[in-house]
C-alpha cells in the first residue's frame, strides 16, 4: 500500500518553486494516478491475480492542502504565513507540527492503516 497525499498550500511562496495553483492542482495529479489504477492500467497493477504486480495499491492519505487562512469546510484546517519558512514553501516548526498531526491522525483512524499502525510492539 502507498498512501498518497497532496502537498500543503503554497500561496506564500516567494519564488517560482511550486506556487499556487500548482500546489492545489497537484491533488488532481494524485487523483488521476489512482483513477488509472482503478481503470486497470497495467503499469499500475498491484494485484498478482491480474498480471505482473508493478505498483503498490494506491490509496488516499491525508489531504494536506487548504486555501491559506480560509478554513477548510470539512475540518477548519488553515495555513498561515507563520506555518512556513522564509521561502513560503517549506513548513516552519508550526507547519511541520500541523502536518505531522494530520498524518498521525490519519494513520490512527484510517481503516486500512489502523490495523497495522496501532499494533503494540
Task: List each model region and its residues.
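Catalytic His-Asp segment of secreted/periplasmic serine-dependent ester chemistry enzymes
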Residues: 6-121
Amino acid at each position: 500500500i502507498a498512501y498518497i497525499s497532496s502537498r500543503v498550500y503554497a500561496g506564500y511562496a516567494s519564488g517560482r518553486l511550486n506556487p499556487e495553483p500548482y500546489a492545489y492542482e497537484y491533488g488532481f495529479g494524485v487523483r488521476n494516478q489512482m483513477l488509472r489504477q482503478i481503470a486497470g492500467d497495467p503499469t499500475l497493477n498491484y494485484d498478482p491475480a491480474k498480471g505482473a504486480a508493478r505498483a503498490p495499491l494506491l490509496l488516499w492519505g491525508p489531504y494536506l492542502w487548504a486555501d491559506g487562512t480560509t478554513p477548510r469546510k470539512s475540518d477548519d484546517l488553515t495555513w498561515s504565513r507563520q506555518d512556513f519558512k522564509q521561502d513560503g514553501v517549506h513548513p516552519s516548526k508550526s507547519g511541520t507540527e500541523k502536518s505531522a498531526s494530520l498524518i498521525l491522525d490519519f494513520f490512527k483512524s484510517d481503516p486500512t492503516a489502523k490495523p497495522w499502525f496501532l499494533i503494540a510492539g
